[in-house]
């Protein structure tokens, strides 16, 4: 628990110190923002700063800092280090700079920014890549809440139908994607964001009250086995199949750095009245998400390694797991991330906890899904030059967009392992998007004659992570660790040589 407290303090100091430095490097001023100069009453409009923060937090969070942190904790306390350093020096900086760069470019979406600084060909690649990722977000985040809702209502044949809830969620997606941002998103999302923050705060208080003995960074960096039979845990087998490098950095994305955020920040960049609010909104929302990830990583360690699962489930359920273990499921297989959320919230927080778990497991992914599709609509509209003031022109894009998303969802449901495959590719695509964004920000800082190492180092690191995952993953090239690591080093050298060559060429032209 001492490591947990130190990590919390580190994130707060990161916001106060490094966040201030990042804002100083960018240099926000009092120039008119797109919310004022391009106001259209649909996507460009001024919203209160507190509301923008809450919407931004909910948009970028979803279930990422919860599910990802729970699974990331299976690697041990080393997950704390990735959340701290990833969030402060990569994720929060990535979100702030991409959001502010969007403001400086009239509220432009990510592909437009990439095209401006990395070239037209890269822009076209990013357009396809971004829209595919956003459609995958929509498909993935409609499937899991539909399963949860059908399970809750399973006593009724109609209300307990998974297909019924998929249709309901998709209808909501269509409405939220088409309507002006202040009609649903501006009114409802702050409430959901408050619920997630309240849940995280209540769990943090519960951790301080219980003060469980957990592995510390300085004594058990990867080994978390304290009170359980190692065979029961299943973490050793998990780590063997998914090596810590690069899989930890893919598993914990939203709590450290996530390329998806760069598609969401422009949504709020179009609603900010003053550039100087960028630090608390963009950098602050990501630090807040990092704190949520820390809390859930600690809850996961308590649940699996301290024996917390025995305290949270009934004696009958505990005996049932023990009886089935021989040839059956390990702890991490029997209690997956959504199950841990439900059990811990209900056990620690009572009836209110069950409601909060429902909001976290259902509302959060749905709200990420609809803003993802809204971003896709705006990215496509920006690319083809179709204004979005009229409902008819919004439908021109939304109809084919939703048709393709439904196609991905149908494939996911028909394939026995479809969800897991989509999720893995979503995780890789998500982090690959951050690579494009970080290189874009690096070029921008070079052109502005500002310190570019702050984006160059994360860009190189995430380039290595994404290339290694592509080389080593069983669902991709599956080359084996030695070949994958060798290949990633070669890619790192190529990326660095490319940048240095471009940098020297650019300097000569100045």
Residue ranges and their predicted role:
Residues 47-64, 206-212, 225-299, 359-368:
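Hydrophobic, membrane-embedded alpha-helices of multi-pass small-molecule transporters
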Residues 7-19, 130, 134-138, 173-176, ...:
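Selective recognition of specific alpha-helical transmembrane segments in multi-pass small-molecule
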Residues 1-19, 72-102, 111, 354, ...:
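Extracellular loop-to-transmembrane helix junctions
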Residues 123-127, 131, 162-167, 284-293, ...:
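Loop-to-transmembrane helix boundary motifs in multi-pass membrane proteins
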Residues 10-66:
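Membrane-interface "cap" regions at the ends of multi-pass membrane proteins
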């Amino acid at each position: 628990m001492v490591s947990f407290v130190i990590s919390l303090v580190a994130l707060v100091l990161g916001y106060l110190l490094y966040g201030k430095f990042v804002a100083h490097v960018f240099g926000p001023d009092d120039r008119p923002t797109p919310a004022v100069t391009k106001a259209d009453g649909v996507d460009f409009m001024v919203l209160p700063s507190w509301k923008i923060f809450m919407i931004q937090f909910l948009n970028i969070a979803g279930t990422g800092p919860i599910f990802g942190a729970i699974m990331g904790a299976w690697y041990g306390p080393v997950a704390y280090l990735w959340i701290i350093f990833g969030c402060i020096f990569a994720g929060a900086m990535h979100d702030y700079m991409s959001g502010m760069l969007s403001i400086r470019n009239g509220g432009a979406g990510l592909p437009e920014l990439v095209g401006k600084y990395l070239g037209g060909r890269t822009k076209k690649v990013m357009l396809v890549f971004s829209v595919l990722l956003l459609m995958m977000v929509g498909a993935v985040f409609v499937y899991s809440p539909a399963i949860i809702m059908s399970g809750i209502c399973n006593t009724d044949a109609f209300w307990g139908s998974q297909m019924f809830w998929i249709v309901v969620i998709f209808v909501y997606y269509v409405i939220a994607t088409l309507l002006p941002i202040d009609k649903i998103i501006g009114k409802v999302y702050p409430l959901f964001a408050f619920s997630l923050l309240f849940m995280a705060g209540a769990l943090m208080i519960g951790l301080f009250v219980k003060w469980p003995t957990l592995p510390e960074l300085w004594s058990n960096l990867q080994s978390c086995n304290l009170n359980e039979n190692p065979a029961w845990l299943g973490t050793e087998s998990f780590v063997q199949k998914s090596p810590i490098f690069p899989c930890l950095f893919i598993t914990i994305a939203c709590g450290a750095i996530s390329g998806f955020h760069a598609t969401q920040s422009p949504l709020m960049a179009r609603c900010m009245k003053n550039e100087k609010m960028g630090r608390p909104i963009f950098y602050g929302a990501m630090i807040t998400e990092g704190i949520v990830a820390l809390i859930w990583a600690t809850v996961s360690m308590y649940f699996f390694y301290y024996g917390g699962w025995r305290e949270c489930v009934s004696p009958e359920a505990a005996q049932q797991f023990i009886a089935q273990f021989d040839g059956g499921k390990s702890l991490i297989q029997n209690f997956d991330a959504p199950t841990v959320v439900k059990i811990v919230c209900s056990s620690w927080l009572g009836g209110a906890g069950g409601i909060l778990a429902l909001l976290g497991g259902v509302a959060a992914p749905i709200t990420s899904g609809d803003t993802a599709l809204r971003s896709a609509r705006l990215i496509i509209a920006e690319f083809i030059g179709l204004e979005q003031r009229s409902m008819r022109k919004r439908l021109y894009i939304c109809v084919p967009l939703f048709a393709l998303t439904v196609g991905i969802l149908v494939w996911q449901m028909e394939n026995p392992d479809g969800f897991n495959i989509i999720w893995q590719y979503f995780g890789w695509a998500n982090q690959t998007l951050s690579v494009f964004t970080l290189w874009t920000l690096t070029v921008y800082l070079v052109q502005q004659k500002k310190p570019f190492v702050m984006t160059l180092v994360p860009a190189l690191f995430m380039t290595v992570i994404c290339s290694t995952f592509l080389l080593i993953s069983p669902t991709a090239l599956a080359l084996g660790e030695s070949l994958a690591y060798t290949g990633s080093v070669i890619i790192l050298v190529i990326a660095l040589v490319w940048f240095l060559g471009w940098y020297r060429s650019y300097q000569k032209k100045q």
